[in-house]
Amino acid sequence: MFKMQKYCKTATWQNLFGFINGKAGKTSYDNSYKESGRALSLRSQTWLRKKKLHCRFAAKIGGGSEMETKNFVFCFAFRSPCTIFVPKKKKMAIIPITSLQHPGVEIFSTLTEAQLRNRIEPTKGIFIAESPKVINVALGAGYEPVALLCEQKHIDGDAASIIDAHPDMPVYTGSRELLATLTGYTLTRGVLCAMRRPMAPTVEEVCRDARRVVVIDGVVDTTNIGAIFRSAAALGIDAVLLTPNSCDPLNRRAVRVSMGSVFLVPWTWITQLPGELHDMGFQTAAMALTDDSIPIDHPLLAKIPRLAIIMGTEGDGLPQQTIAEADHVVRIPMQHGVDSLNVAAAAAVAFWELRDRQG
């Protein structure tokens, strides 16, 4: 029998059937060894099904070897005893707070968005994601968590899976009233996560395989940025480029409004507009009301292989130089005397009408 460890369970049956996701079923260890025998006892079946952990089963068959499984159980038929290894859970770093001055919580309270972004040292930048759904989207996209802030009830509730997956991450918890004071608003979704800001990719990296991109020029409203990203993700935009005078997509409110879409669509900053796009073979379409603009449903636009849609603010619109340098100037036909839409609404219309129909 293999060497026992304190956190091990031991099976000493002569032969075992496999149990996969709680269902009895046969399995073979390799091409040369086939199972036979009786199933696990009911008690052992129940114990195994309750352990939603990464379990390692080591069965001494022939020379002895092992196989790892996740979230489901394989039990091998064998002719000698085996040990079931269940790794210990690391102790979670739960930190109760009773004061706004508690060390470590300043990233959720006193630091401004500019300080969190840390333009001087981008690798030290932080952003805040709110709600378990948005946090999980960020984690799934590869973003690194730094710390979690939540009400006590969420530790074993909505935030449990996040905490379990990152046992070394500090988790700050306090009363609903204290957390509302700390963050400046009531945590209706109950969970905030400070996450590491990655280095921004280059325009070439983001646009390498893209056919439809949007350029956001000077849009500073966080709600509009979040809404544009959500529409971009939903309607098939391959990448988002922003001029430096635009709002940071990882602003807390922008992330919240986007429902995590900022983590789903590649994005970066662009400084050479439209030169960098032309160098990569893109044609540009500036959204503006001019005498020579063409309607957004013009057949010519749908045939363009690589198209960059440039959008400005609702009030000031795009700079005249940007419009003059664009390959096309495009407008959305409107009725009842309305001459413009909110930039987020206009973006949704443009993304749908100018979507890639060839891919």
Predicted regions and their residues:
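Short, positively charged and aromatic/hydrophobic N-terminal segments
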Residues: 3, 7-9, 29, 33, ...
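Boundary-proximal intrinsically disordered activation/regulatory segments immediately upstream
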Residues: 87, 92-152, 247
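Amphipathic alpha-helical repeat scaffolds
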Residues: 131, 220-228, 341-346
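RNA substrate-binding interface of SAM-dependent RNA methyltransferases
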Residues: 140, 171, 196-292
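A glycine-rich helix N-cap at a beta->alpha junction
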Residues: 167-184
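Structured adenosyl-cofactor binding patch, chiefly the S-adenosyl-L-methionine
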Residues: 193, 231-235, 244-263, 320-359
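Active-site/ligand-binding-proximal alpha/beta "capping" segment
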Residues: 286-338
